[in-house]
């Protein structure tokens, strides 16, 4: 078995809850406690060229901003990473790695941007950073497309390639299938990663599934403190760490994570709760983007059976998009059909 590694993404994915406005003291506190717990990697936020520097926010315009906020902190033996959503941060915003406190950059991209994203990753790697490929919306890839991903990835030779279950749609069998293809196709020195979302409450078990893979490859899994993150949240870092201590021979200090939760996370949870919600469950059950469900539920006149019926009419190639015009048209069509059916019933009753 290869090494089993843990990455904390609280300051990045957790930012969807508070618009990345953690506050400087909380950012430092989370960093110091998570690093002190012994995690292998910590992601300190997003690099986004359209944002302006704010010491209270973990959405930063460039690596110089990262250096200002985190550069003087004791990183111990933890790999420090930032994330770029492809095409939101120009390469000129990145200093050479030797001038930065970042060890690596995770680049997330969707299938239709695969080739240009990998070209960008080459540029990032040329600056000296460890590069991580984040395959967003992994459920949108066919087996053949995953094999092509392996071919292109082997050519760039990143540190890691991660399966990203963006909408929390995967079950353990799905995950084992995808991981098996990637494990067989990737060069052996490329780490296989996994990032879960908890829409179907499977984030923890899916993460454990990846950790239990029979592979000589290194495996890296993500978690966030108290599961703080987009939609229904992520796999909770403290639970994954406990599992890894018990099953992977790790020695993470769970108490340090708990302290960070109490001092820097719970206040955000009280203001904007995350976790299991009907909206995200219905979206995941129908394999569609949550925005479609939000639109239909905001109408407040539709029974759940009607919501499911309308969602099932979304074409496969639009299920994970955010096509407002499409869902409006499907809703209008459903209403017309419902009205026509009601008129026919009334007419039939009148005639009898």
Task: Give residue spans per PLM region.
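Catalytic cores and adjacent flexible loops of soluble metabolic enzymes
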Residues: 1-352
């Amino acid at each position: 078995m290869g090494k089993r590694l843990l990455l904390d993404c609280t300051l990045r994915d957790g930012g969807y809850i508070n618009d990345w406005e953690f506050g400087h003291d909380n950012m430092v506190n989370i960093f110091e406690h998570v690093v002190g717990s012994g995690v292998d990697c910590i992601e300190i936020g997003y690099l986004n060229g359209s944002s302006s520097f704010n010491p209270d926010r973990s959405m930063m315009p460039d690596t110089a901003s990262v250096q200002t906020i985190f550069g003087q902190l004791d990183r111990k033996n933890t790999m420090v990473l930032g994330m770029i959503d492809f095409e939101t941060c120009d390469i000129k915003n990145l200093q050479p790695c030797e001038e930065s406190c970042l060890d690596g950059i995770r680049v997330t991209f969707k299938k239709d941007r695969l080739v240009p994203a990998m070209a960008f990753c080459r540029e990032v790697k040329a600056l000296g950073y460890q590069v991580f490929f984040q395959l967003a919306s992994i459920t949108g890839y066919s087996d053949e497309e995953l094999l092509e991903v392996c071919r292109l990835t082997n050519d760039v030779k990143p540190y890691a390639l991660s399966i990203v279950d963006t909408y929390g749609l995967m079950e353990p069998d799905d995950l084992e299938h995808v991981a098996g293809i990637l494990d067989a196709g990737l060069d052996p020195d490329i780490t296989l990663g996994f990032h879960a979302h908890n829409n179907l409450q499977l984030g923890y078990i899916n993460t454990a599934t990846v950790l239990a893979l029979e592979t000589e490859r290194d495996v890296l899994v993500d978690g966030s403190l108290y599961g703080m993150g987009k939609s229904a949240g992520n796999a909770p870092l403290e639970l994954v760490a406990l599992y890894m201590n018990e099953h992977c021979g790790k020695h993470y200090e769970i108490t340090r994570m708990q302290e960070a939760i109490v001092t820097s996370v719970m206040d955000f949870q009280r203001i904007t709760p995350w976790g299991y919600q009907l909206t995200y469950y219905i979206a995941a059950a129908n394999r569609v983007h949550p925005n479609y469900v939000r639109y239909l539920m905001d109408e407040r006149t539709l029974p759940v059976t009607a919501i499911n019926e309308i969602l099932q009419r979304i074409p496969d190639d639009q299920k994970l998009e955010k096509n407002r015009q499409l869902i409006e048209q499907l809703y209008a069509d459903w209403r017309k059909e419902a009205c026509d059916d009601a008129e026919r019933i009334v007419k039939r009753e009148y005639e009898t």
